[in-house]
Amino acid sequence: MLGKIKPLSFPRDYDEFLSDEKNRRLLAAYREGMNATNVFYQALTFAKVIEGMTKTIPRPDNSGAIDSRRRYMSTRIPAELSDLPVTSNEIVETFRPFLGKKFSWVREHFRPLVRNAIAHLDPDEDTLDIDRIKDVQTCERAVPVLRYIARSLLLQGFEDWSNKATQHGST
């Protein structure tokens, strides 16, 4: 993969955020994706973070949850390539089909790739194969987008957690 990757950093009080087991597990999965050398594994772990973060977003039956849920559902890939925090032109181009799209739409777009083609192996079906360059390239194009969404959701989750902790006087 080409491009400069910005380290994931949290503002003050991050240690309390990290002490929550769910948060630690999500951050561990993100770290696994960042450190993996296999693009199939990167795609799978970033998809796991996205899935996990969407499950941590409060459902509308909880207090204050409607705003959090609405915020996630409306979070989008930037509409302009220049608004992406990516320096490599090659990687920026992988975002073009997703410009302005909601995270939830992009997540559903990649579901067949990650869930079916990577996570499962059915000898009778056409699944991704690490020995086919076309399949490796498919994952290479997906990983920057999945990484961007996973990172954005983690940061959004931290912000939501931090705001909730501040409201309850625990910071």
Model-found features: residue ranges?
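Amphipathic, oligomerization/interface secondary-structure segments
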Residues: 7-171
